[in-house]
Amino acid sequence: MRVKRNLAGIKKDGERPDLVEYRRRQILQAAKKVFSEKGYHQTNIADIARELKIGHGTFYRYFKNKREIFESVVGEIIKRVSTVVSGEDPGATNSLDEYIRQVRRLGEKLFALFVEDPTIARMLFYESWGLDEEMREKVWQMMGTFGRYTELYLVNGKKKGFLREDLETEATALAINTLIFESGRRIAKSGDREKEKKTWMNTVINLMFHGIKKQE
């Protein structure tokens, strides 16, 4: 399915800043789709131009090259995920029940990204990692930032007494995030993403708070 809008007739000079941003986002939207379908190395500017029904020259007024477009696409994805991850106050919960509800809210919002836009998973977990060391480092830094943010929730639970005193918060936070991102990858690849989301949502919650031992 092609992006419906096109950029035909763009003026060369005197564009309003809001129009420049709008057109950049159009290019990024189309580029994300093409990169996720063909991969970075198999994609060229002509493929993205074809998706938008524009000439090659238009691109070079907004982006220097394919690499810059790719980095911008990944940057936008990281912003979207970051907005969800930072959408709750780590210190707001005062009991285990409140924390479980908070985790479920965050999980629902985060997993919804992968349901609504499976290209996010493709870009983050495949194309970015496979590009080069510089891009892998950017994604690695993102993972580290999310890990530190997740740790704040665990520190709050220890401080207020509803999580174990001996909990290794840093390692546990990274383990939780690994599970969450693997869930997102699986959701995005599923033929029934809504069903897969529910399965992984319940699995993550149960594993975090009840473990795998038989309940007495």
Task: List the predicted regions and their residue ranges.
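C-terminal peripheral helix-coil segments that are non-catalytic and often amphipathic
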Residues: M1-K11, R105-A112, E116, R148, ...
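Helix-turn-helix
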Residues: E15, Q26, A30, V34-E68, ...
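Amphipathic, non-transmembrane alpha-helical scaffold segments
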Residues: V20, L28, F70, V74, ...
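Short coil/turn segments at alpha/beta junctions that flank glycine-rich nucleotide-binding fingerprints
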Residues: E37-H41, D117, K160
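Hydrophobic alpha-helical connector segments
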Residues: S72, G87-E116, A173-I176, K198
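Amphipathic alpha-helical packing segments from all-alpha helical-bundle domains
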Residues: K79-S82, S86, E133-K160, E170-L174
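Amphipathic alpha-helical segments used for helix-helix packing
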Residues: L113-E134, R185, K189
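Short, hydrophobic secondary-structure boundary micro-motifs
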Residues: R122-L124, E165-D166, E196
